């Protein structure tokens, strides 16, 4: 009886020591690229469906939201159901906890499926809203804090990607936060293990290159920040003394006044045939919103669209919607009589 218990304990110890190997960086990137390809097809289908149900204007107004919705659907029907995405099946990967001792829990995978596409979107929206409020209220301190937070996020992302190239553990920050790590769902043969080890070494070379790039990028920022912090009090006291003398005088000369509000602007709508009569009837509709142009604007290639339609389009994709020629928002010209 004692011998049987001893054998059972030894068997359990061996079973607990049996772990699937962690996935390497090239395999994780390969799975991610495959998922991006599938998500791109899904985004295209969702966009076409919204065109049929709503309109082209709706699709042009919410391209980012439609993309997020398609990615959320993809993750909910795969990861959210504790299954695997097509990219993970393609490379034969699955999620485990941070140490690789057990599979990731269902609740964690559901929360991750929501957080992965939605968190970056809401963070970006919040940052843009803060910056917009700062410009309207002219609060310099809050603007500097927002700029600092953006720089801090960029620094964290750079460090995160550098660690990934060296260790190959977490490809996204969301997975690092949730502690969801990839493992192969099969035992690697000797040849496959050697092949993947060679691929990991090549990614480490990229890690060293990225590390050198980040050092050159962030070293001047770090030194200037430390210098400002060391001499900040003295400079602040001097600036307060000097600015208190001529603050009112400078504000009177440097402030910009008389900027009209949006409601005070004169808009041109081509539904009125007296507006820009040289434009023929067949060319007076915007192909983006399928309505008569409002404030007709010209891209560098010469094609005409509504100001708001073309500006929204170029912010997402800097190109002409018709001929795909390069078009930056600052290159758009508004037509006037």
Swiss-Prot record:
Written domain comment of the UniProt record: The three subunits of the retrotranslocation channel (PEX2, PEX10 and PEX12) coassemble in the membrane into a channel with an open 10 Angstrom pore. The RING-type zinc-fingers that catalyze PEX5 receptor ubiquitination are positioned above the pore on the cytosolic side of the complex.
PANTHER family in UniProt: PEROXISOME ASSEMBLY PROTEIN 10, PEROXISOME BIOGENESIS FACTOR 10
Organism: Saccharomyces cerevisiae (strain ATCC 204508 / S288c) (Baker's yeast)
Gene label: PEX10
Pathway listed: Protein modification; protein ubiquitination
Residues that span the membrane, as ranges: 25-54, 56-77, 106-138, 146-166, 203-222
Gene Ontology BP annotations: proteasome-mediated ubiquitin-dependent protein catabolic process; protein import into peroxisome matrix; protein import into peroxisome matrix, receptor recycling; protein import into peroxisome matrix, substrate release; protein polyubiquitination; protein quality control for misfolded or incompletely synthesized proteins; protein ubiquitination
Subunit-level organization: Component of the PEX2-PEX10-PEX12 retrotranslocation channel, composed of PEX2, PEX10 and PEX12.
Protein name per Swiss-Prot or TrEMBL: Peroxisome biogenesis factor 10
Pfam families documented for this protein: Pex2_Pex12 (PF04757), zf-RING_2 (PF13639)
Taxonomy, superkingdom: Eukaryota
């Amino acid at each position: 009886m004692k011998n049987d218990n001893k054998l059972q304990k030894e068997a359990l110890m061996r079973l607990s020591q049996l772990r699937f190997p962690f996935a390497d960086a090239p395999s994780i990137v390969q799975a991610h690229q495959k998922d991006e390809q599938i998500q791109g097809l899904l985004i295209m289908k969702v966009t076409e469906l919204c065109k049929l149900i709503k309109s082209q204007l709706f699709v042009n107004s919410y391209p980012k939201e439609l993309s997020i919705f398609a990615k959320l659907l993809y993750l909910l029907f795969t990861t959210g159901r504790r299954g695997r995405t097509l990219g993970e099946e393609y490379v034969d990967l699955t999620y485990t906890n941070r140490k690789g001792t057990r599979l990731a829990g269902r609740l964690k995978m559901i929360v991750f499926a929501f957080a992965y596409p939605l968190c970056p979107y809401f963070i970006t929206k919040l940052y843009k809203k803060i910056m917009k409020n700062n410009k309207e209220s002219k609060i310099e301190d809050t603007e500097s804090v927002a700029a600092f937070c953006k720089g801090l996020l960029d620094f964290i992302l750079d460090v995160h990607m550098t660690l990934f190239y060296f260790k190959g553990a977490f490809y996204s920050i969301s997975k690092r936060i949730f502690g969801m790590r990839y493992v192969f769902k099969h035992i690697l043969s000797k040849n496959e293990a050697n092949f993947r080890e060679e691929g990991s070494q090549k990614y480490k070379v990229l890690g060293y290159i990225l590390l050198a790039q980040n050092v050159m990028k962030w070293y001047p920022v770090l030194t200037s920040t430390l210098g400002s912090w060391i001499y900040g009090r003295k400079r602040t006291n001097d600036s307060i003394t000097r600015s208190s003398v001529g603050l009112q005088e400078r504000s009177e000369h440097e402030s910009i006044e008389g900027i009209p509000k949006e409601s005070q602007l004169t808009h041109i709508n081509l539904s009125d045939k007296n507006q820009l009569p040289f434009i023929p009837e067949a060319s007076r509709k915007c192909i983006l919103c399928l309505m008569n142009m409002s404030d007709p604007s010209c891209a560098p290639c010469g094609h005409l669209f509504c100001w708001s339609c073309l500006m929204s389009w170029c912010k997402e994709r800097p190109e002409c919607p018709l001929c795909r020629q390069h078009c930056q928002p600052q290159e758009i010209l508004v037509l006037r009589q």
